[in-house]
């Protein structure tokens, strides 16, 4: 089997309700997603997607993704799509850094492999593990005047009514306000529910220490308190709550450094940030071997990103799987049919071969690039 063609599309993904809030502020109301289609000489096509969240959040942005995808496509047309690890090593040599650009190509390879084998991608990633997968729900407050502890607690109760039991808060404007928000949400938690406070690396080290002291007796997981790994390692020494790291985990080396320093209890593995499903699987397996809780995740996207994420989550051993998410619930555009959406706070599953998706070509529109 050979890759004979790569087709690259871009789609704007407006956010439901407006800009998606992070501790550092608000993101754009819409983000550019890059969708890659790889065609083979045996008539099987695979799909993948990447959607960075603009220049304010992490490495990469939408316009860079599509330009990088055009360059990377030229390196793999003519190659055997079933040799996934070999292709990963090829583009790591020929295309340094910019891991997010590689993620949609890697997903497309797994999609092809699953379709060729007649198996869902999760089977190829290690197998589907038992048990339901709870989805965490990022709690949205779209207006600054809503930013009160009571509003955060009410929104958690709204999402509880939809079946969610895991609530992800965002840090408030000050350390005192963040402590008050965490207290208000923890006060309304029911048995079996879980709360996380995600700073997105936005807290200063002194504020992070103050917050940790203020919530040390509350059932809250602190997520990505500070911007750098060094700060997070030092923060761990001053925090009694469980810690989940996210933005500072980009490579296997980052994971091992954080573990060696005792800096985290849970590790978020965002597929696009680490360079695709292949690298994400490797990092997940290391987490399992080390006894660290894993959170299969991704930055943003539509059905293609969300399906890859779901298969990654289902192939993660139940004991080490904290939760996951369904990113289609945050955007207004549907790019493919066949996706098993989450319901009642739990992740969906499809046993269709590959990623199980049929693209909506009218949504994908005219290709930005075609490489043959």
Regions found by a protein language model. Name each.
Residues 24-29, 97, 353:
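Short Gly/Pro-enriched turn/cap motifs at secondary-structure boundaries
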């Amino acid at each position: 089997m050979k890759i004979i063609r790569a087709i690259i599309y871009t789609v704007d993904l407006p956010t439901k309700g407006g800009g998606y809030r992070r501790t550092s502020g608000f993101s754009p109301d819409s983000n550019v997603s890059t969708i890659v289609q790889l065609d083979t000489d045996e008539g099987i096509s695979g799909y993948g997607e990447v959607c960075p969240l603009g220049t304010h959040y992490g490495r990469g942005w939408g316009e860079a993704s599509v330009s990088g995808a055009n360059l990377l496509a030229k390196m793999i047309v003519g190659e055997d799509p079933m040799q996934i690890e070999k292709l990963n090593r090829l583009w790591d040599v020929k295309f340094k850094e910019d891991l997010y650009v590689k993620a949609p190509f890697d997903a497309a390879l797994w999609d092809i492999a699953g379709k060729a084998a007649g198996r869902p991608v999760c089977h190829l990633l290690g197998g589907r593990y038992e048990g339901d997968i709870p989805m965490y729900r990022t709690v949205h407050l779209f207006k600054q005047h809503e930013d009160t502890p009571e509003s955060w607690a009410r929104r958690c109760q709204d999402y509880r009514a939809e079946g969610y039991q895991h609530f992800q808060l965002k840090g408030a404007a000050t350390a005192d306000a963040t402590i008050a928000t965490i207290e208000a949400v923890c006060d309304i938690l029911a048995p079996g529910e879980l709360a996380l406070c995600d700073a997105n690396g936005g807290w200063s080290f002194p504020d992070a220490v103050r917050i940790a002291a203020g919530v040390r007796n509350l059932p809250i997981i602190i997520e990505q308190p500070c911007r750098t790994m060094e700060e997070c390692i030092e923060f761990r020494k001053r925090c009694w709550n469980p810690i989940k790291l996210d933005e500072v985990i980009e490579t296997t080396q980052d994971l091992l450094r954080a573990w060696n320093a005792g800096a985290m209890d849970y590790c978020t593995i965002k597929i696009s940030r680490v360079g695709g499903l292949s690298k994400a699987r490797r990092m997940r397996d290391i987490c399992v071997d080390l006894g660290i809780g894993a959170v299969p995740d991704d930055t943003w996207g539509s059905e293609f990103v969300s399906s890859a994420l779901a298969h990654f989550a289902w192939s993660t051993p139940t004991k080490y799987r904290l939760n996951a998410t369904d990113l289609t619930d945050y955007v207004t555009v549907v790019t493919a049919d066949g996706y098993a959406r989450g319901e009642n706070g739990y992740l969906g599953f499809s046993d269709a071969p590959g990623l199980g998706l049929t693209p909506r070509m009218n949504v994908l529109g005219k290709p930005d690039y075609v490489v043959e």
